[in-house]
Amino acid sequence: MSVELWQQCVDLLRDELPSQQFNTWIRPLQVEAEGDELRVYAPNRFVLDWVNEKYLGRLLELLGERGEGQLPALSLLIGSKRSRTPRAAIVPSQTHVAPPPPVAPPPAPVQPVSAAPVVVPREELPPVTTAPSVSSDPYEPEEPSIDPLAAAMPAGAAPAVRTERNVQVEGALKHTSYLNRTFTFENFVEGKSNQLARAAAWQVADNLKHGYNPLFLYGGVGLGKTHLMHAVGNHLLKKNPNAKVVYLHSERFVADMVKALQLNAINEFKRFYRSVDALLIDDIQFFARKERSQEEFFHTFNALLEGGQQVILTSDRYPKEIEGLEERLKSRFGWGLTVAVEPPELETRVAILMKKAEQAKIELPHDAAFFIAQRIRSNVRELEGALKRVIAHSHFMGRPITIELIRESLKDLLALQDKLVSIDNIQRTVAEYYKIKISDLLSKRRSRSVARPRQVAMALSKELTNHSLPEIGVAFGGRDHTTVLHACRKIAQLRESDADIREDYKNLLRTLTT
């Protein structure tokens, strides 16, 4: 049984599941083959149990179909390909968690756990076993201080928000904890695009030390990741005003570390960051290629999880896709729960506008909100910016908000939107280029001569328009947004490995943008 066959089945499952479900439960799985056995590694017990209960049956069906009826012995384990215990003995007809061998007590985040056997309901399914796995990367609490960096690392400014509370530590190092009081769960507008992320954040905020740890939120700019992070912090302080909750941008962590090295106060730096109750770090991708910062954060992360302290991280991309980030950090980020925050769909955009207008005590007609939401699709930040312009124009002109006033106040923005490439134009151009009919792109045909141009057209639509994935899917014959996401990723891979696809995409891009 080859890993390639497993990947084929995962790709098929990607098309069947909503992107949030796939990215949360299936994407973190790692796999390797040894003889006739296929080993699948989950990052933690929670993911393993969920996959076992919800997706194992379908995965085995796909393996059987693709493997021409020959099913492998499948083992589900906790850990990763680089960090695992020897495989458990295979037990017929049921999954079984083998008791761990006697070992020295490991750090809490990677402590072996056991569970009651889970019976596979179908007699014809192959034996499946689960076993815990122990990390081989122990926390090193007494990491020696090193000399200051030869070359100074860039240090970004902290978020421009009102300081809520100061936290001081013994010694020279002092730090301010930033939380924006206006970012709460109560004023966060929930929709299909952020439903799972909001639920996970609330679980952490309301059940500290019993929620997901770490919680990793990822997605494009202006989609609400930072809002949710602040909402967690504000809720924790509401429940316990004495809690040490620290929010900061990743570059602030770098700046504090450099300053501590310069002041010969690295021990105070460590003591401060490792004594918080909850550490909230925004834009973790800025740690990329900062080796010393990654080293220090690695030990800080381990210390916090060992002490049962909460860590919440955000990034603009899936952790495995952050280039220049050490694999050991990527692996640890998967210990808890990783959730995508998608661009808001039309209904959510309208709800956001109505909520913002209510907060500003402005009367916004529903048709006016709908008009703005239809034309501003990229992210919440741009949506709010457009609404502020409309409100200001209404105030200065002394006129109520109408569609006519919106056209006046946003005329430059709307003119820019009108110049954007349309999906119809992309479909027409791609069909002409590949000498097929537009109706073929919208059809259910799956032959390569049609499927590949369709994927190219979807990828171009994602790159050149502001339409959301669901909207692009509807434009291509009512397809699901997960199909669009799969097409975009597939074309991105082929542009790296296939010269013909790379040239086709380049030519089409030039045609559509000139």
Curated annotation (Swiss-Prot):
InterPro entries: AAA+_ATPase, Chromosome_initiator_DnaA, Chromosome_initiator_DnaA-like, Chromosome_initiator_DnaA_CS, DnaA_C, DnaA_dom, DnaA_N_dom, DnaA_N_sf. Residues 178-394 are annotated as: Domain III, AAA+ region. Its main location: cytoplasm. Keywords: ATP-binding, Cytoplasm, DNA replication, DNA-binding, Lipid-binding, Nucleotide-binding. ATP binds at residues 222, 224-226. Residues 1-90 are annotated as: Domain I, interacts with DnaA modulators. Residues 395-514 are annotated as: Domain IV, binds dsDNA. SMART domains: AAA, Bac_DnaA_C. Signal peptide: none annotated. GO terms for cellular component: cytoplasm; plasma membrane. Domain I is involved in oligomerization and binding regulators, domain II is flexibile and of varying length in different bacteria, domain III forms the AAA+ region, while domain IV binds dsDNA. NCBIfam families: DnaA. Belongs to the DnaA family. Plays an essential role in the initiation and regulation of chromosomal replication. ATP-DnaA binds to the origin of replication (oriC) to initiate formation of the DNA replication initiation complex once per cell cycle. Binds the DnaA box (a 9 base pair repeat at the origin) and separates the double-stranded (ds)DNA. Forms a right-handed helical filament on oriC DNA; dsDNA binds to the exterior of the filament while single-stranded (ss)DNA is stabiized in the filament's interior. Non-cooperatively binds DnaA boxes in the plasmid RK2 replication origin (oriV). In vitro in the presence of plasmid RK2-derived TrfA and E.coli protein HU, forms an open complex at oriV. This complex was not however competent for formation of a pre-priming complex with E.coli DnaB and DnaC. Broad host range plasmid RK2 requires not only DnaA for replication but also TrfA and host factors. This is Chromosomal replication initiator protein DnaA. It comes from Pseudomonas aeruginosa (strain ATCC 15692 / DSM 22644 / CIP 104116 / JCM 14847 / LMG 12228 / 1C / PRS 101 / PAO1).
